[in-house]
């Protein structure tokens, strides 16, 4: 299985290492020509969603990736990636891919000092270690969106 990892900014290396441990082959998406390769899934990593969104547009990668996601490309998104997929971002007019009917709250857990680690239940998987560093959470979802996990009554997956 070949997984493309958005590698413009953020925590892409951590995702690649874990995917390779699980037996996947990873390719990094850094420029438009990288999208010419075949891949079976996509990872949108944590980082800074505003920077990632800006770079995707400047590098002319945005429309192609948005179409692939809309067409059903399996996509894993963490932190900034979650923000990129949201149809609404609390207190912000601009959205990015807008592919999941949900509203997210950026930096919902506060500043760096508000970071924490926990182990919580993930639907269909079991207990999963989770780390939150200036992480978003999901304020609300529309019909058809499955909630996979909550932390302190906040939707996180």
What are these regions (language model features)?
Residues 1-58, 63-71:
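N-terminal beta1-alpha1 cap of cysteine-dependent amidohydrolase-like domains
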Residues 8-9, 29, 46-47, 78-80, ...:
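Fold-independent oxyanion-binding glycine-rich loops
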Residues 12, 35, 84, 91, ...:
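Flexible, glycine-rich phosphate/dinucleotide-binding loops
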Residues 48-120:
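Cysteine-nucleophile active-site neighborhood
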Residues 106-157:
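Amide-donor transfer/coupling interface in amidating biosynthetic enzymes
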């Amino acid at each position: 299985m070949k997984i493309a990892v958005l590698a413009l900014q953020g925590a892409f290396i951590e995702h690649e290492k874990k995917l390779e441990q699980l037996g996947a082959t990873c390719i990094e998406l850094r420029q438009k020509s990288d999208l010419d390769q075949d891949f079976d899934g996509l990872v949108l990593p944590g980082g800074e969603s505003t920077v990632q969104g800006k770079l995707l547009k400047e590098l002319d990668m945005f429309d192609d990736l948005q179409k692939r996601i809309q067409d059903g490309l399996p996509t894993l998104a963490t932190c900034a990636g979650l923000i990129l997929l949201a149809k609404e971002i609390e207190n912000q007019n601009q959205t990015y891919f807008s592919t999941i009917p949900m509203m997210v709250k950026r930096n919902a857990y506060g500043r760096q000092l508000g970071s924490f680690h926990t182990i919580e239940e993930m639907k269909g998987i079991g207990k999963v270690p989770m780390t939150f560093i200036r992480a978003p959470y999901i304020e609300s979802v529309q019909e058809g969106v499955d909630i996979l996990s909550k932390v302190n009554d906040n939707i996180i997956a």
